[in-house]
């Protein structure tokens, strides 16, 4: 009789654990990520923010730029390639050479690696 009750209890427990495991809050942004967020908002978001247009997004959203093996252009999704595209420009993207120093570029990359998440309150 006990074993008949144990299985449903274990199933309910497993479902609850899995449900709450997905409810974690985002950890706070590091100082570098927060600086990158500010740079993104000031210099990138006005072109790369998501919108509700039914058109193909040009320029692309950067929310998951490092979640894929390649960038929207088909080149590898690496820090070096993103740095190159930002500083040299590519296609319709203008060059930002001279607008980011090395520390700022590293901060922007750190923020892009977060998937553009918000910090926990």
Where are the language model's segments positioned?
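Processing junctions and N-termini across compartments
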Residues: 17, 38-41, 87
């Amino acid at each position: 009789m006990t074993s008949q009750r144990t299985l449903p209890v274990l199933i309910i427990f497993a479902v609850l654990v899995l449900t709450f495991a997905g409810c974690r809050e985002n950890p706070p942004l590091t100082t570098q990520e927060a600086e990158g967020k500010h740079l993104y908002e000031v210099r990138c978001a006005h072109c790369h923010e998501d919108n509700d247009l039914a058109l193909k997004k040009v320029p692309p959203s950067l929310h998951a730029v490092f979640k894929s093996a390649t960038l929207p252009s088909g080149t590898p999704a690496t820090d070096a390639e993103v740095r190159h595209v930002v500083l040299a420009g590519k296609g319709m993207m203008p060059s930002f050479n001279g607008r980011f120093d090395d520390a700022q570029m590293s901060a922007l990359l750190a923020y892009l690696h977060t998937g553009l998440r918000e910090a926990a309150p």
